[in-house]
Design a protein with these regions (language model features):
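Short proline/glycine-enriched turn/loop segments at secondary-structure junctions
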Residues: 16-19, 82-87, 119-120, 131
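Helical lid/core segments from catalytic subdomains that handle acyl or acyl-like groups
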Residues: 20-102
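Hydrophobic "lid/gating" helix adjacent to the active-site nucleophile
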Residues: 1-18
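Short glycine/proline-enriched turns and hinge-like loops at secondary-structure junctions
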Residues: 3, 20-23, 107
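Low-complexity, glycine/alanine/valine/leucine- and proline-rich hydrophobic stretches
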Residues: 90-164
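Short beta-strand elements
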Residues: 14, 27-30, 130-134
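A generic structural motif
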Residues: 16, 31-36, 145-150
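Flexible helix-coil linker/hinge segments at domain or subdomain boundaries
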Residues: 55, 162-173
Length: 173
């Protein structure tokens, strides 16, 4: 196991606190507990951190949300613009996002949309983006990675499936 946990940047969309249409976008970082061997402990800790942070963000004004988001994004954007992204330590190791899609089945000219597969982007100096999308009764995960840092995304996808099975077994046994 690694000495320090991987840290994920998690973007989220929140209802606008001012009641206007659209979303307020924010984000936070969360340790993924990859330095711990117990998968159940990992999930419990991640759930506690994400639940607590989302609750705090839901209570913020739109101005506070914007300032909070800017504080998190500013170092990333400045390092990208100045070209020093490889010199300063990263704020996080990967991005993990969840895209909310319709839960009812969609059709186009009578043909059913069977699945949605997510794709996302990478910033310079960051090696991996994992995006999860739920549609109807299915969940799909998309992996976008830097070839030099993550040479086999296919293996990562397979290992992720195996880890999810292990996690399910440990939680529901």
């Amino acid at each position: 196991l690694p000495e320090k946990p991987l840290v994920a940047s998690i973007p989220i969309a929140l209802p606008r606190p001012d009641g206007k249409p659209g979303n307020a976008v924010a984000g936070f970082v969360c340790p993924l507990e990859t330095d711990k061997s117990d998968p159940k402990h990992r999930v419990q800790t991640i759930n506690a951190v994400t639940s607590r942070t989302k609750k705090q963000l839901h209570g913020m004004s739109l101005k506070a949300l914007n300032q909070f988001s800017f504080m998190g994004v500013a170092p990333l954007m400045l390092s990208q613009m100045a070209g020093i992204g490889k010199v300063i330590p990263p704020l996080f190791n990967l991005v993990v996002s969840n895209v909310v899609a319709p839960q009812k089945k969609l059709y186009l000219k009578g043909s059913e949309l069977e699945a949605l597969y997510p794709i996302s982007l990478l910033f310079d100096g960051y090696a991996l983006n994992v995006t999860i999308v739920g549609y109807s009764d299915k969940v799909a995960m998309g992996f976008v990675g830097c070839r030099a840092a993550t040479p086999s995304l296919q293996r990562l996808a397979v290992y992720t499936g195996e880890a999810l099975e292990e996690l399910e077994t440990s939680i529901f046994e």
